[in-house]
Amino acid sequence: MKKEFIMLLLLLQTIMNLNSINTNTSTSIVKELQKNLYIFNSKEYQKDKDTLNEFINSININDKEILQSLEKIKNELFIISVFFNNKKGILIALNLGAEINFKYKISPISISIINNEFEITKILIDYGISLNQIDDTGYSPIFWAIYTNNEKIFEFLKESGADLSFTLKNRKTPMQAAIETENIKLIKSLEKKKIYIDDNFKKKLKKLKNKEIVRILVK
């Protein structure tokens, strides 16, 4: 990531020998990690993930003072826990009352799909996250499942009630996205549901180079 974590590491070294974290430290760690979200392939990613793991594991859930401190930053804790694939952190934040549909540029469920984290995606859906929310990326979760070719999460979203006819501002539908990626399994899955295809797009289908897609959709 762009910023160094020297100060953060010094804070961690200071509390290594303590039995539990203090309120100021918990806030500092969460705030520092939040500053550097969404650089998925950063060289610092694993180090930051390990930092969060150490932090989460040091939380004493029986310490009311610590929980009160975390409650003030529950949404921030929630989003960084999703980003760094920390299930324990996610559950702590949600049980503290974090907003399930809280988004910091990218929605939590979009992050879990991009990270290919099925279990976290399932947790978020079980807790009632919106399946059709469009975040700052301009896409809803079903589109992220399609564009990452994540068939398992796509099917789970479909079974969980995601809108398969959801239309973006540019009038693109999930079917059109699946055709773009040439994912035959997803195209067949959508076709079985008789998903809407824009009339203008239908005219272009016969000209597709992928004849298998043409055979499936042009009847």
UniProtKB/Swiss-Prot annotation:
Start and end residues of the ANK repeats are 104-133, 137-166, 170-199
Q: Which region is the signal sequence? A: none
Disulphides: none
PROSITE patterns annotated for this entry? ANK_REP_REGION (PS50297), ANK_REPEAT (PS50088)
Q: Which Pfam families match?
A: Ank_2 (PF12796)
Q: Which InterPro entries match?
A: Ankyrin_rpt, Ankyrin_rpt-contain_sf
Q: Which SUPFAM superfamilies match?
A: Ankyrin repeat (SSF48403)
State the superkingdom: Bacteria
Instruction: Please provide the record's keywords in A-Z order.
Output: ANK repeat, Repeat
Q: What is this protein called?
A: Putative ankyrin repeat protein BB_0399
What organism, scientifically named, is this protein from?
Borreliella burgdorferi (strain ATCC 35210 / DSM 4680 / CIP 102532 / B31) (Borrelia burgdorferi)
Organism placement in taxonomy: Bacteria, Pseudomonadati, Spirochaetota, Spirochaetia, Spirochaetales
